[in-house]
Regions:
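N-proximal low-complexity "stem/linker" segments adjacent to membrane-targeting elements
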Residues: 1-32, 39
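Donor nucleotide-sugar binding loop of glycosyltransferases
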Residues: 19-22, 50, 73, 99
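Conserved donor nucleotide-binding strand/loop of the catalytic core
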Residues: 37-44, 55-83
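Residue-level signature of catalytic and energy-coupling elements of molecular machines
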Residues: 12, 30, 80, 95, ...
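A conserved acidic beta->alpha catalytic loop
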Residues: 47-55, 96
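Acceptor/aglycone-binding surface of glycosyltransferases and processive sugar-polymer synthases
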Residues: 68-83, 88, 100-183, 210-230
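Hydrophobic helical membrane-anchoring modules
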Residues: 1-7, 155, 178-394
Length: 394
């Protein structure tokens, strides 16, 4: 499996799946760098089931081969990193698109007390993309969009979240507690590094055309979606709270206005039917906010995201029962008043313009009240689970 270096300073991890065409070049460049800069380092090739002899190529050149049965880019890297012996780890693809002679930049940053070091291929971060090295959609749509969203969601300042060459300390990797098996592993790493406030920086790298004759493992739309999906899952604020808040405010304001009187705007009259539409929007917004609160609570309890600085919902069962009961009482009062109006006309036809507004608002209050009561019990269950987990934490 290759000779193990005693007490290396740096482990270079290369995920590998049938990379016989380019693996030797990557290993030789890394060994050349170790010699030129007097770096005590080891190379770990995380093999994900190659059938083209990649394992023998790696071992013949002195790399340590770590078989990883679980398939996927992230799975291979996790297996290789777990086997690393050094305190500093640098990862890079084995397709010769990254020049491993650039790793001294990463090592220098790690030696200067950085926990996480991202490579940047874009000129904005000092990097360079050689002609033909990156597809048009990746360069001008996919990576810029994902990078911008990452800056908004996780408040990092990286200019290239998809760069495959990056470095970190073994301790930082353990703190990140990454879970993804696929290509989204790269996005999860950046998000987690930002969320747990690792000391981070970015160094320029050059992206070269892929040295293989076959198609790359990356699939533009499938893997792009997987990156975006994972970023959203790790950011309940933007997935739930922002849309929920917008819909709740829009629906709530318009419901209050139309519950009192019709509204005419440039000859267009918004009346009872429009009121019901905005009630639906308000209800959807509140639902999304509740889902977001539940999602955040669950993610925090399972250490998927850091604990928030917001105060938890104190006594959720009692709070849900109190507010839910209040809305139900108000709703029931409206229904009783509507019933009295109906009785006054001998249970005959009612004037719609007088009663339907109150009737729909009353129904909405009862539905919302019932939901708050049962959501309170659900939060109470999560609260019990959280306390149990804390009690069993060593």
């Amino acid at each position: 499996m290759g000779e193990k270096i005693v007490n290396p300073e740096v482990t270079v991890v290369m995920p590998c799946l049938n990379e016989a065409e380019t693996l030797a070049t990557c290993i030789e460049k890394t060994l050349e760098t170790f010699r030129s800069y007097n770096i005590k380092g080891e190379i770990v090739v995380a093999d994900n089931g190659s059938t083209d002899g990649s394992q023998k190529i790696a071992m013949d050149l002195g790399a340590r081969v770590v078989p990883v049965a679980r398939r996927g880019y992230g799975a291979a890297l996790q297996g290789g990193i777990a086997a690393a012996s050094a305190p500093y780890i640098i990862m890079g693809d084995a397709d010769d698109s990254y020049d491993f002679r650039e790793i001294p930049r990463f090592i220098e940053a790690l030696r200067n007390s950085h926990d996480f070091v991202m490579g940047c291929r874009f000129p904005a971060g000092g990097g360079e993309i050689k002609p033909g090295a990156m597809p048009f959609l990746h360069r001008y749509l996919g990576t810029p969009v994902l990078t911008a969203l990452g800056q908004i969601f996780f408040h990092h300042r990286f200019k290239d979240v998809n760069c495959g060459m990056r470095g970190f300390t073994k301790r930082a990797f353990e703190e990140m507690a990454l879970q993804s098996d696929g290509m989204e592993f790269a996005s999860e790493m950046v998000a987690r590094a930002a969320m747990i406030n690792l000391k981070s920086c970015e160094v320029p790298v050059t992206l070269h055309p892929d040295g293989r004759s076959r198609a790359p493992h990356l699939r533009t739309w499938r893997d792009g979606w997987r990156h975006l999906k994972f970023m959203l899952l790790l950011c309940p604020r933007w997935l739930y709270r922002m849309p929920g808040l917008f819909l709740s405010l829009l629906g709530g304001i318009m419901t209050l206005i139309l519950a009192i009187t019709p509204l005419s705007v440039q000859g267009i009259t918004l009346d009872i039917h429009t009121l019901m539409v905005f009630q639906m929007i308000l209800f959807l917004g509140l639902q999304i906010l509740l889902f977001g609160h539940l999602a955040s609570y669950y993610a925090e309890q399972n250490h998927l995201i850091p604990p928030s600085h917001q105060k938890p919902w104190v006594n959720p069962v009692e709070s849900g029962a109190l507010w839910g009961g209040l809305f139900m009482i108000l709703g029931a009062s409206g229904l009783i008043y509507t019933f009295d109006l109906w009785r006054d006309v001998g249970f005959g036809p009612l004037e719609t313009s007088q009663t339907l507004r109150l009737f729909s608002i009353s129904i909405f209050g009862i539905i919302l009240g019932l939901e708050l009561i049962f959501v309170g019990f659900l939060f109470g269950l999560f609260d019990l689970m959280g306390k149990r987990n804390k009690d069993h934490t060593p």
